């Protein structure tokens, strides 16, 4: 082997071997235990960032470890290729999104190969490939036939100048990103999938998902948002019908002091026709789209409609207001306001001087002032007529019973979850496979006409979707009759909701999935990705899996057995304040820093002009702060194994990882040291086999350390997924190897065993260098095909142990003794120890406390 570690050559050798031997290509082997490891596939944005590298390194380490356990391991990779950024890039570069996307895929695929990830590239898929989305279109038609798809009017961002629909991210400060026009809220017909039909199952199945982080399950529970309450109707004064509301707190019914309706509610529209100020307010609400997440923090505004509702228990008249915090899409678009016992209702009541009544008192003797602050806990009813004195729980039941008996209310279960709107008015997505006949009938495109292909050779004008702008594209026919194709495309979450299943049979052309392959590989054993996908992607994928099950394509009910959500990659930020009040951010690679003794940056200057820059602190790597580190630059400088080792060593996978140049250099030094140790060892020729019966103390110590390391690393990687502590254990082992430097045959034997072990257990983490070192250590097989080492229990048994000797609780000596020494012998040894005798001389020994295997404490006075 070469004396010097040359990452470029070493890594090329390993990659050539894997590619030539198709090492990672797998097929179903029914008799062999399978392991399907999947990292969330990337959007082909142009080049990999460090977040990708961290995610995919974790996945590759787990995959290679499982392979060494003798499992049939599948680790595929593909591209989540549709989406808005491709359209924006195409407009900027005056090219077609397909061309930009495919060129990015080529570049990023090469980067993934350079990092040595063990992917089965024969399974590669891109979601923009018609052979992929044709099956999504086929599946949508099946869902339509099952009644799980419907169309309804839904609100979009409308640019009145460009006459086009804008995505939320194309609305900047309420204006269209290109035209600058004030964006309006407009209702258009859109397609929805009934995820709410599966709400209960999606919620209940979380209970059995032991391999998922509790945090993610909680986020999904909250998103599904199951609640039990009462739906009741307040009659309207001098109006037909009534106001139906849903409440989880019927116990607070006597505290209602106003009603609030959404701007789109029929009652708000009726009031707008009568009062100009109401009409203006309703228009204002309609054009300022509010995301549900913003409701809590935004300013609450409203206006009195002039209508009155009648309280169902007291017959009191209650004013009906239009309020900007009530959404038509949630519940009934109306709510009963109880300002004494709800913070939002309280804030609104204070602002508009509406009555605030107390109807719940604390269970204890606390003093509360309901005018100052809402009391939102449950308690005991007060000022509630015949219900006063009941607990909130008792009143819930009694009031619900009364409303049901009177026919004005009923107990209901409600979900926060809304049906999934899958229509997008964008071009770069999979066309929705629906068509409209001349008589207005809507139906799925017949299977024999799929895929509905997206034309790829297009020009983007930045305004209209090319398929909406081309009147010819949407022309088709059905049974000889003219028909018109839908020009909306699918939400890109559709593609990522089933890609994991298509990887099982990516080239299967007889159906969406090959059931035999799907049921062999699924569910995914380990899924890895960022926690930002906890709700939408992971919930949609769970939903899709149940749909796949219900059309008979898979047997299982959940897609992912274990989920690991890796932490973010952070880096220092540097900037200068500009005259206009903005900031210019500088990349860490362009800045020279000085650090204090603790490694904190204390001064930073820009390399180009030598002038100081401000230190902005450590934050997530991002384009906006320009603090991303290009993985390619680090690979070119130090090699892929160094990047992989740093990523795995710097932090446990779930925690944030702070980028550190010195940490990267430390990882590189460790690999050079490992190379040098193997080189020095192999220069002495072949080592004999270990003869456990003929080892001296130092040789036994190294052998014990080797097998303790195997036990620790196995547990760290398989159960705990703490790769950083596994690497630290190997570093300790190599320190021990360095201490046993003599050339006795059995010293060489235990050293060979230790180095073999280090290379084996590091091979999932730094596979290129280990591929070369394994062969240098004299093995004819490849390390990627080797089995994971097994700890030898007998090697870990200590023949000698160190015992601490104390007098009156203070350490006075340490002795090496046989591991099986008895209590009496230990006591004798302690009392005869020179140092112990020095501290007991002239004193009476009162008692001797022996803790076997640990210490002896002599009590004397």
Curated annotation (Swiss-Prot):
Keywords in alphabetical order: Aminoacyl-tRNA synthetase, ATP-binding, Cytoplasm, Ligase, Nucleotide-binding, Protein biosynthesis
Localisation: Cytoplasm
InterPro entries noted in UniProt: aa-tRNA-synth_I_CS, aa-tRNA-synth_Ia, Leu-tRNA-ligase, Leu_tRNA-synth_edit, M/V/L/I-tRNA-synth_anticd-bd, Methionyl/Leucyl_tRNA_Synth, Rossmann-like_a/b/a_fold, tRNAsynth_Ia_anticodon-bd
A Pfam family of this chain: tRNA-synt_1g
Motif ('KMSKS' region): 620-624
Catalyzed reactions per annotation: tRNA(Leu) + L-leucine + ATP = L-leucyl-tRNA(Leu) + AMP + diphosphate
UniProt keyword annotation of GTP-binding present: no
HAMAP family in UniProt: Leu_tRNA_synth_B
PANTHER family according to UniProt: LEUCINE--TRNA LIGASE, MITOCHONDRIAL, LEUCYL-TRNA SYNTHETASE
Assigned protein family: Belongs to the class-I aminoacyl-tRNA synthetase family.
Record-given protein name: Leucine--tRNA ligase
Organism: Marinobacter nauticus (strain ATCC 700491 / DSM 11845 / VT8) (Marinobacter aquaeolei)
Organism classification: Bacteria, Pseudomonadati, Pseudomonadota, Gammaproteobacteria, Pseudomonadales
GN (gene name): leuS
